[in-house]
Structures are given as C-alpha cells and as structure tokens.
Amino acid sequence: MKELIIGSHVSFQRKTQLVGSVKEAVSYRANTFMFYTGAPQNTARYPIDDKLTQEGYQLMEENGIDPVDVVVHAPYIINLANTAKPDNHRFAIQFLREEMDRCAKLGMTRLVLHPGSHVSQTREEGIQNIIDGLNQVLTTEESTYICLETMAGKGTEIGNLDELKQIIEGVEHSEYLKVCIDTCHLNDAGYDMTKFDDFLNEFDEKIGIDRIGCVHVNDSKNVCGAHKDRHENIGLGTLGFDTLYKIVTHPKLKDVPKILETPYVTKEDNAKEKVYPPYRFEIDMFRNGKYDPELLEHIRDFYK
C-alpha cells in the first residue's frame, strides 16, 4: 500500500521562506505541507527568494517530500463572489493572479481558494461573479491548479457540491480547477462524514472524483449541519478519530495530499493562549492507525 501523504499547515517566513517551511514539516514527521506565501489576512507580500527556493527543494528531496504534493493556500481576503464594490472585485482578481504567479515561481502546483461570500448579492449572482473572476484569472497555460475549497455554509459562503459543480461548469479553462475537501467544513455544511463512501459517490456523480486535489483533515467542534466552521483536534470533536482515519486512508484518495489545520494546543486545560502545534502527534496517530487518548498531555510534555 502506498505511504500516506500527510502533513499540516506550516509557516512561510520572510527570512527563511521555503527552507523554513520544509524544516517545520520535517519536524512534524510529515511528507507534505501547506503554506501561505504571505499573511493570509492582508496583501503584504515580499519577493520569492530563488536561492531559498532551491535550498527548500534540496531539503524536500533529502526528506522524501514530493513537491507535487505540496499545497499553497490563497489568502482569505480574496472574495470573488461579491461585486458590490467593483474595485474590490478587480483587486481580488488581480491578487489571485499574483498568487498564481508566485506559485509558479515556487514550482507549486496546488493553490487552495475559498470560493467567497456573496454578502449583499444573491447566491446566483455570487456564483456568476466567481465564474467571471476565474475566467479572468485562468489562461490557456497554467502550471498551478486552483483547488476550490468546500465551505461550511457560514453566513453567505458559497462552496457546497452543487455550487462548486456550477462554478466548474461555467469556467472556460476548468481543466485547471480542482476541489479541496475539508472534513470539518463538509460536516458543518450537512454532509455525513460517517458515510464517506456515499459522499464520494455524490461527489463523483456531480463533479468527478479525479477533481479532488487536496483534503483538509480537521475534526469539528459542531454537529453535522451547524454551518459554523470551528476546527477541533483529531479525535476530540464530533467526527472522531475512526471516521477521519477512514477518510485519510481511503483507497480512492491515496494519491491526494492530506493537510491538517487543527488548532494549536494550550499549555494547560483552562489556559486561553494556544501555543503548541499538534501536528507531529496527529500525524503519528494516522500513520499508526491508533487514537491516542492522552493526545493533549503528550503534546504538552513534548514541547514544554
């Protein structure tokens, strides 16, 4: 059986860039990772350093990480779904194009994008706005796929399977579109993750299973259909370890990178500040196929 392709969100810092990202991923015993090329919540971007990129690739090769499996996440501030302020929509299109170019410079082939929220406009208008935006971004020759993320349906978010199907069908160069399925978002949107084969069948029927380009692996703090989007550590939420393990090891997804975006852990139960990354331990649980009931204690002991 092919080795599990699993990693987590890691940082991408100005001074170390890809080198720092790879080192962090390796410290979690991961064989893939996901990063933002700058801050997710603003437009500040610094130039990609070719030397650091080259060193990062060397480190990946030394540590068994295939660059094809590495994922970039587009910043949250890109909202293609709303055109109430045309300047903002034009900016979102331009900024997404720049992110695609940064991915190309880094040699990254997967860019995850939140489809957006229609806000004051109708859902249908929002979907059409996304289609129009993607048609302006995507050209005939891209080296990076945009992976549209399944969303929880919070507020006016767009991103259930029917909406993603409509977007993909409306985009001219849809050969460059894939989907990132997020287990927490799907649960919160009302899809039953305990019946994952049924979900995959529905996905295959509506979109095509070959379009799955990434899996965000998160437990959820909420019940199915809550439309909330609050991630929880693996095994501590409403989905549970067994359900997530079946998804992560599903044979139809064996070639798809799995990325953890679970919350950092506090120093003690009642503390508020989350300081310890859980990923090394959550990855180990999935590799071993066994839930650790003392997960939080082991994370705290390791980092303190």
Question: Residue spans of the language-model regions?
Answer:
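N-terminal pre-domain/capping segments
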Residues: 1-72, 80-98, 289-304
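Hydrophobic faces of well-ordered beta-strands that scaffold small-molecule active sites
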Residues: 4-10, 31-35, 68-74, 111-113, ...
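Active-site beta-loop-alpha junctions enriched in small/polar residues
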Residues: 9-13, 38-40, 75-77, 116-118, ...
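A short, acidic, flexible beta-alpha connecting loop/helix-capping segment that sits on the rim
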Residues: 13, 259-277, 302-303
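Active-site acidic/histidine proton-transfer and metal-coordination neighborhood
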Residues: 16, 61, 79-178
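Acidic (Asp/Glu)-rich catalytic clusters
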Residues: 22-29, 49-71, 97-107, 135-142, ...
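Acidic/histidine-rich catalytic cores of soluble enzymes
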Residues: 131-234
